Amino acid sequence: MNGEKKTVNRDTVKWIVEAVLLLLLAGGICAIAYNTKDVERIKTLGSSSYAVGIIDDDGKIDTETKTAIHTKNLYPLNEVKIEMDKGANVTYTLFFYGTDKELMSKTNAQSSTYRGTFPEGAKYFRVMITPTADEDGIVKGNELSKYAKLVTVTYKNK
């Protein structure tokens, strides 16, 4: 009995290999699901997010004044990034709202990338895009998409 080797049952080895592979597969699926969750939370506003009109100094929508376009809704203020196309003939103004959805403050007209700070207590935002070289100074419905595409607004949805 002194020189005998112990042999491991092939079924046992096969079971161990299968268990390890299943654990690796489950871990991979969890990692993908976690990363996908983050990607789904990052949103980009498209043309359909905007309407013709302005946001007045009180943070209210004015659809009678057609010199700009604005986001239709308030969006959660977690992380916001605003980028403009090079040579864009627009500016944008960012409006900050509190939990009561009342205007807290706004930025000056911006013409470059925004990754700024937010007022303390601000929970929501809206964007107004104002053309700087519109022929007649009035934004028409067919121009909305053109102006909206010049400014890319991305935000993280909780």
Which residue stretches match the model-derived regions?
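Noncatalytic modules at the cell exterior or secretory-pathway interfaces
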Residues: N78-E83, F118-G137
